Structure formats: C-alpha cells, structure tokens
Amino acid sequence: MAKERSGAVTMRGNPLTLIGPELKAGDAAPNAILLNGSLADTSILSADKVRVVSVVPSLDTPVCDIQTKRFNEEAGQLGDDIEIVTVSADLPFAQVRWCSANNVDRVICLSDHREMAFGNAYGVHVKELRLDTRAIFVIDRQGKIVHAEYVKEIAEQPDYAAALKAARAAAAA
C-alpha cells in the first residue's frame, strides 16, 4: 500500500490526503507511464532534455488554465534543451481539445487518468478526488529531481520563477 500523507494539501482550506512519497530535490525521479494525445504510452523521463513537469488537477479549471498557458508562453524562451510537460488526470481527448482551443502548442500534455501511476509515484494523487494536486518538478538529463514544489493550497499558483530558474541551471550544467 502506498504511503498516505493526510492534510498534505488543502482545497479552499479543506485538508486533503496525498498518496505516494513526498519527493525532494536530489531524489531520483521515478519513471511513470502516462498516455499522450494519441493514447500511446509515454514515459515521464527524457534522456536528452531537462523536463519541467507541471502537474495540474484539470485543465478545465481557472488556475490550471493559467498555469498551463503560462508555461506554454515560457516554453518559447527556454531553448531546445528544456521541455515542459503538463500532467493531469484529464482524459487524453480532453487534453487535446483544451490545447487546441487555447492555442497551447509548446507544452506536452500527458494523462494520468488510466492508473494514476504518475500521481502515486510522485506523491501528487489526491485520494479524495482521484486527481493530481498542483505541483512542479524539474528533472535533469540524468533523471534527478532538481526542484520540487507541492503547492499547499490547490487553488493557488505555483512559484514559476523558482521552477524556471532550476530548469535553466540544470540545462546549463
């Protein structure tokens, strides 16, 4: 049974339970298989690029919308050594529809819907909602986490500047 972290995050002040470990900078990034927009299995790890993994509960909510659009804008300024991946428990079809409707084309969207494998491995699976909580992980080319943020209040935005700074530093290393 996966570890449960009661009260690890809140939604509008109400405590929620996260399933899985709390990962920190320096930890090895677990691999997890997610679905892409074509329903193909896709690994969260990338051997040749630094990855900013932006985790959102659902693209169809206001803060998740803002977060994903913000990272799409930032992706154009990061260069070829860094890629941004958005993970949510939305169906892959919903992710494709949302990206198309919002002109989001520089972020890779991957779905954790099938097994919540990513959520369980990265400690972002919200037990009460079967969604992933808001978080950001930066993973270097060697598969090490160099930045991790679990946003305490799901309705708040993450620290974009800290994640982007960590990604740029990892790409320059």
Q: Which residues are covered by each model-predicted region?
A:
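Chalcogenol-based redox active-site neighborhoods
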Residues: 1-173
